[in-house]
């Protein structure tokens, strides 16, 4: 049996002992604190690689396994390229799930949270993610949320945090308000799934709209580095629209209503005005016309059904600014009070929603466009749409009946939450109800222990019931604390900066460290955060830039979104009973097998169906890697004498790794490693394991494999007799001669008879060709015990060994 086949049989019959490797190397890596960055190293170039931090809702799941596999792949890649890599870890540990679990089980949300953090931390360490654990943070630690409060006060000082009474999104299940970004298109809560209703409450907002243009314009800085769909989602969410605000007089109010439109050319098709159910003008008109009770009842029912074409005749009229005609005014369920002034000039002849509403309420439908030209539009008839748009706008502005405006879909960020487990808002109120910011020296405003607090959602903040905490006597006066807590997306809007100075107690981070490490070079996480976390982080970064705390305008230079891990095509969930348990899979298959199999399954952005993930194939490959490393001698001849064909394959892979990583084609690298191993094993059969090209190939595989399966790679590296650790090894430099030069087939003879062939470079030297020919196992065997009288060498075509007769 050939040696190669024997080795293959051995590998397939051997169990891949992943547990032994994990038990061997995990404590060594932890002991040596292998992945802590050297802050004193000012010479080595730096990279900051970050995974979106985890919420501690239980043990890790397969979604975590996928995300951390990709993030760790990139961090290890940059280390192998000679960079000092910051790759920190932490937990987004405030939030509703902990509070709801505490209510359900009668426990403390703090205890529940930190128990889950400990469990996840153990799993993360086993998973061999190369984190710098010295920078670990939890957003529920006072040492962290102190700086949440500091940041809030900075925003308040600059007029970007304010409190007002407004219609807000109310989650009736979690009994707290939601930001617009947390309400799904179907009107349900992004977290609880409950139908969201509207409530009028006094709440805290952040003026993100002040940054709308910059948030939109600076997306151009991220093109080709962020997924296009994320950029598109943010662009659409910000929703910049250029148009005209047109004045419609309402005689019963004795004042006009301003209506924003992007299509002023349709003004002659207006047959009614539609107002938002919850606007003040709507209530005022309903009250004057005696239909306020109907409005309130209808609004309440609409909140429950989310019906899109319900309305109410307000029995009032507006005056058309150009024709002078009276136009009926309706309250309409499809009009948003917080967008474009909460009023729409309705053109049912050219808008499908307006048309449905007009049909339902028997309102006129007028066509004013035909073949892209205006009709029935007075002096503007016959003009093209573009001409009429400009001319009507100009005339309205000239008559002071309109003005050019830019409107945004983006609304200010509502951050008040009527729940316990979050950052207290650092504001006091005096006896007159005036707002007084807490002094920075008095931070943090500590969250009181939950013992004795009724956490059951009531619509009121649980903190309001702790009178000793709420009421504060200071300088002879009585003050009352704000009892709401902050949206936890505030916590995550700047956490990547706290990693730079996690132990600093004089500032959240320093400008020096921000300049040194920021911004994040590579960010890894799910697309579900496109218009939540990612937008908020961009806003806060721009604010910090404005006040001189960072010197960059965007937080994350590059972004990779991974797909979901599904089972039989369905999203995993506890309710469906189709959860694949992380700990069970790791126990059964091992970390390295899972990591390699996940990455090999396809491009990161695509969903992975767990049933299609090949554990057996991954385990077989890793076993062969270790067994092949054992075949390679500790010392080999000069590399220049290595097999040319194998070196071409090795250097082709080395040459392609950079662009494959840059384009996130990690699965292609996995396939190339498997190919290189197969080629190497076949070469062992023909040229022997002691050929220096064999060692070069296996060392290259070990270094590259560290990005996938670090336990196996570290074991291979030790077997090969190299200096610990493989994670510090650099990729060999690419020898471009193997990429550019042509090869040819050289004939190897003994006494003029063909005994073998070699694939060699056309510029191979006589010495190299003779050495390579002698290294062929068939030639080595034939010349054993015989004296070579003469060597005839004609590079690159021929080597003939002339031997003494037996």
From Swiss-Prot:
> A cellular component term (GO) from this record?
cytoplasm
| Name of the protein in question | Leucine--tRNA ligase
Q: What is its main location?
A: cytoplasm
Q: Motif span ('KMSKS' region)?
A: 571-575
Tell where it localizes: Cytoplasm
Q: Which UniProt keywords apply?
A: Aminoacyl-tRNA synthetase, ATP-binding, Cytoplasm, Ligase, Nucleotide-binding, Protein biosynthesis
InterPro entries assigned to the protein according to its UniProt record, in alphabetical order: aa-tRNA-synth_I_CS, aa-tRNA-synth_Ia, Leu-tRNA-ligase, Leu_tRNA-synth_edit, M/V/L/I-tRNA-synth_anticd-bd, Methionyl/Leucyl_tRNA_Synth, Rossmann-like_a/b/a_fold, tRNAsynth_Ia_anticodon-bd
**GO MF terms, alphabetically ordered:** aminoacyl-tRNA deacylase activity; ATP binding; leucine-tRNA ligase activity
EC numbers, comma separated: 6.1.1.4
Give the matching NCBIfam families. leuS_bact (TIGR00396)
Show where the record puts the motif 'HIGH' region: 54-64
**Family membership noted in the UniProt record:** Belongs to the class-I aminoacyl-tRNA synthetase family.
Provide the residue positions that the database annotates as binding ATP: 574
The species this protein belongs to is Tropheryma whipplei (strain TW08/27)
According to its UniProt entry, one GO biological process term is:
leucyl-tRNA aminoacylation
Record bears the keyword Nucleotide-binding: yes
Pfam families reported for this sequence: Anticodon_1, tRNA-synt_1, tRNA-synt_1_2, tRNA-synt_1g
Q: Which reaction does it catalyse?
A: tRNA(Leu) + L-leucine + ATP = L-leucyl-tRNA(Leu) + AMP + diphosphate
Q: Which gene encodes it?
A: leuS
Q: Which domain of life is it from?
A: Bacteria
């Amino acid at each position: 049996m050939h040696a190669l086949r024997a080795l293959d049989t051995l590998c397939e019959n051997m169990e891949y002992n992943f547990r032994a490797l994990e038990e061997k190397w995990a404590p060594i890596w932890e002991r040596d604190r292998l992945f802590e960055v050297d802050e004193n190293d000012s010479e080595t170039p730096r990279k900051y690689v970050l995974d979106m931090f985890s919420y501690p809702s239980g043990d890790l799941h397969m979604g975590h396994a996928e995300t951390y596999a990709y993030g760790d792949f990139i961090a290890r890649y940059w280390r192998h390229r000679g960079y000092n890599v910051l790759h920190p870890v932490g937990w987004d540990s405030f939030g509703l799930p902990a509070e709801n679990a505490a209510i359900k089980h009668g426990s403390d949300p703090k205890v529940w949270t930190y128990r889950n953090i400990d469990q996840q931390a153990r799993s993360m360490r086993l998973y061999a993610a190369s984190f710098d654990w010295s920078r670990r943070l939890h957003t529920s630690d006072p040492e962290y949320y102190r700086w949440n409060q500091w940041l809030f006060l900075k925003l308040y000082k600059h007029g970007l945090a304010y409190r007002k009474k407004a219609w807000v999104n109310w989650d009736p299940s979690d009994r707290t308000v939601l930001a617009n970004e947390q309400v799904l298109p179907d009107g349900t809560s992004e977290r609880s799934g409950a139908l969201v209703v509207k409530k009028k409450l006094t709440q805290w907002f952040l003026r993100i709209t002040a940054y709308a243009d910059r948030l939109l314009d600076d997306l151009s800085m991220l093109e080709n580095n962020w997924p296009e769909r994320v950029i598109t989602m943010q662009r659409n969410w910000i929703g910049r629209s250029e148009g005209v605000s047109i004045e419609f007089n309402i005689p019963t109010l004795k004042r006009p209503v301003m209506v924003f439109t992007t299509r002023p050319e349709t003004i002659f098709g207006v047959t009614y005005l539609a107002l938002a159910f919850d606007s003040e003008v709507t209530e005022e008109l309903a009250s004057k016309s005696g239909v306020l009770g109907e409005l309130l009842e209808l609004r309440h029912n609409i909140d429950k059904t989310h019906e899109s074409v319900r309305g109410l005749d307000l029995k009032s009229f507006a005056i058309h600014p150009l024709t002078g005609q009276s136009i009926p005014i309706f309250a309409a369920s499809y009009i948003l009070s917080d967008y474009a002034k909460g009023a729409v000039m309705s053109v049912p002849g050219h808008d499908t929603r307006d048309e449905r509403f007009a049909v339902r309420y028997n309102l006129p439908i007028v066509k004013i466009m035909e073949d892209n030209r205006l009709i029935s539009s007075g002096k503007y008839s016959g003009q093209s749409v573009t001409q009429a748009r400009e001319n009507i706008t100009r005339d309205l502005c000239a008559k002071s009946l309109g003005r050019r405006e830019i409107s945004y879909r983006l609304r200010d960020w509502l951050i008040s939450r009527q729940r316990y487990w979050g950052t207290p808002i650092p504001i006091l109120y005096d006896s007159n109800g005036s707002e007084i910011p807490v002094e920075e020296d008095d931070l943090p405003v500590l969250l009181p222990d939950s013992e004795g607090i009724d956490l059951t959602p009531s619509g009121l903040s649980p903190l309001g019931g702790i009178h000793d905490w709420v009421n504060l006597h200071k300088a002879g006066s009585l003050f009352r604390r704000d009892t709401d807590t902050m949206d936890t997306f505030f916590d995550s809007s700047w956490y990547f900066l706290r990693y730079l100075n996690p132990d600093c107690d004089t500032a959240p981070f320093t400008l020096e460290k921000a300049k040194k490490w920021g911004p994040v070079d590579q960010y890894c996480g799910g697309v579900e955060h496109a218009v939540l976390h990612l937008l908020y982080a961009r806003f806060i970064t721009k604010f910090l830039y404005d006040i001189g705390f960072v010197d960059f305008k965007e937080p994350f230079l590059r972004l990779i979104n991974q797909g979901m891990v599904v089972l039989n095509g369905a999203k995993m969930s506890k309710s469906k009973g189709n959860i694949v348990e992380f700990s069970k899979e790791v126990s059964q298959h091992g970390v390295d097998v899972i990591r390699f199999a996940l990455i090999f399954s396809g491009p990161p952005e695509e969903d992975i169906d767990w049933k299609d993930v090949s554990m057996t194939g991954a385990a077989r490959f890793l076993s062969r890697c270790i067994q092949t490393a054992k075949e390679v001698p500790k010392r080999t001849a000069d590399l220049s004498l290595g097999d040319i064909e194998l070196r071409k394959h090795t250097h082709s892979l080395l040459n392609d790794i950079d662009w494959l990583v840059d384009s996130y084609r990690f699965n292609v690298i996995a396939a190339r490693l498997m190919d290189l191993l197969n080629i190497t094993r076949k070469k062992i059969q023909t040229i022997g394991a002691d050929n220096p090209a064999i060692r070069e190939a296996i060392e290259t595989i070990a270094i590259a494999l560290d990005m996938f399966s670090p336990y196996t790679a570290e074991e291979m590296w030790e077997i090969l007799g190299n200096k610990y650790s493989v994670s510090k090894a650099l990729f060999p430099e690419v020898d471009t001669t193997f990429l550019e030069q042509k090869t040819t087939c050289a004939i190897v003879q003994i006494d003029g008879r063909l005994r073998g062939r070699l694939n060699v470079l056309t510029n191979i030297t006589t010495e190299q060709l003779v050495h390579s020919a002698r290294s062929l196992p068939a030639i080595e065997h034939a010349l054993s015990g015989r004296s070579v009288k003469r060597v005839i060498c004609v590079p690159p075509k021929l080597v003939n060994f002339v031997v003494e007769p037996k």
